[in-house]
Amino acid sequence: MKVISSIQELRDQLRGQNRVAFVPTMGNLHEGHLSLMRLARQHGDPVVASIFVNRLQFGPNEDFDKYPRTLQDDIEKLQSEGVYVLFAPTERDMYPEPQEYRVDPPHDLGDILEGEFRPGFFKGVCTVVMKLFTAAQPRVAVFGKKDYQQLMIVRRMVHQFALPIEIVPAETVRAEDGLALSSRNRYLTEAERAEAPMLYRTLHDVRDTVLGSDRAATRLATVEADACATLAQRGWKPDYVSIRKRSNLQAPTPEEFAAGEPLVVLTAAKLGATRLIDNLEI
């Protein structure tokens, strides 16, 4: 596996490869990331991964400086998965001058849910993903469904810019107790780690309530509020539990809900100092 930091060197290395499968990451790789590499191999060849902790998507009070950086360990894991190239640029490689041009997602998708609680987050995500796409020029890119809103935003960006890239969604990988694998799980204390699966169980409770309800009579706002209250009673600080349409992440109208619109429930909540996100399709 070649480890490359320069955009030009990456382009030179991939010249003539017409079915690159690309997996962008921020490193500190776990089994969830490695499952993306395996899925990428099913859709293209060669597989190219990137590791870059992107300052543009971190807010002023977020964990950019303490975000775990484990490059050597990550390299060994990617080698074991048969990845062809790892693109691991420095900040200077990616942003040799101030990044004055940004990709700003539409407000109806970028300023809700995560975008409401992390202003500017998706602008940073879209900007770096677009730059990574222009560097690697893939035909396939794999994104995990754990970051459901990010997946939707990237998919729409690719469509509206007419990029010749197939976006492949990957199912969330979970621990045996249901907790979605995340690099931020390492911040949890032992007691918090024991409590953390409650987030996924709460999503299941919401799904069961919706599926078992009379859709014509059920108020989704009440279901969402009850789920937030359940988490709060257990010591969580929920930002949201929100039931949305899978198609565009807008709230369903009562008529759409009653007609059986495909839905997804998304959540973000703090447990101690650690903010976790998760989702479940209904």
From Swiss-Prot:
<keyword id="KW-0067">ATP-binding</keyword>
<dbReference type="GO" id="GO:0015940">
    <property type="term" value="P:pantothenate biosynthetic process"/>
</dbReference>
<keyword id="KW-0547">Nucleotide-binding</keyword>
<feature type="binding site">
    <location>
        <position position="57"/>
    </location>
    <ligand>
        <name>(R)-pantoate</name>
    </ligand>
</feature>
<dbReference type="InterPro" id="IPR004821">
    <property type="entry name" value="Cyt_trans-like"/>
</dbReference>
<feature type="binding site">
    <location>
        <begin position="26"/>
        <end position="33"/>
    </location>
    <ligand>
        <name>ATP</name>
    </ligand>
</feature>
<keyword id="KW-0963">Cytoplasm</keyword>
<feature type="binding site">
    <location>
        <begin position="181"/>
        <end position="184"/>
    </location>
    <ligand>
        <name>ATP</name>
    </ligand>
</feature>
<comment type="function">
    <text>Catalyzes the condensation of pantoate with beta-alanine in an ATP-dependent reaction via a pantoyl-adenylate intermediate.</text>
</comment>
<dbReference type="Pfam" id="PF02569">
    <property type="entry name" value="Pantoate_ligase"/>
</dbReference>
<feature type="active site" description="Proton donor">
    <location>
        <position position="33"/>
    </location>
</feature>
<dbReference type="GO" id="GO:0004592">
    <property type="term" value="F:pantoate-beta-alanine ligase activity"/>
</dbReference>
<protein>
    <recommendedName>
        <fullName>Pantothenate synthetase</fullName>
        <ecNumber>6.3.2.1</ecNumber>
    </recommendedName>
</protein>
<comment type="similarity">
    <text>Belongs to the pantothenate synthetase family.</text>
</comment>
<dbReference type="GO" id="GO:0005524">
    <property type="term" value="F:ATP binding"/>
</dbReference>
<dbReference type="InterPro" id="IPR042176">
    <property type="entry name" value="Pantoate_ligase_C"/>
</dbReference>
<feature type="binding site">
    <location>
        <position position="150"/>
    </location>
    <ligand>
        <name>(R)-pantoate</name>
    </ligand>
</feature>
<comment type="pathway">
    <text>Cofactor biosynthesis; (R)-pantothenate biosynthesis; (R)-pantothenate from (R)-pantoate and beta-alanine: step 1/1.</text>
</comment>
<keyword id="KW-0566">Pantothenate biosynthesis</keyword>
<comment type="subunit">
    <text>Homodimer.</text>
</comment>
<dbReference type="GO" id="GO:0005829">
    <property type="term" value="C:cytosol"/>
</dbReference>
<dbReference type="InterPro" id="IPR003721">
    <property type="entry name" value="Pantoate_ligase"/>
</dbReference>
<feature type="binding site">
    <location>
        <position position="173"/>
    </location>
    <ligand>
        <name>ATP</name>
    </ligand>
</feature>
<keyword id="KW-0436">Ligase</keyword>
<feature type="binding site">
    <location>
        <position position="57"/>
    </location>
    <ligand>
        <name>beta-alanine</name>
    </ligand>
</feature>
<feature type="binding site">
    <location>
        <begin position="144"/>
        <end position="147"/>
    </location>
    <ligand>
        <name>ATP</name>
    </ligand>
</feature>
<dbReference type="InterPro" id="IPR014729">
    <property type="entry name" value="Rossmann-like_a/b/a_fold"/>
</dbReference>
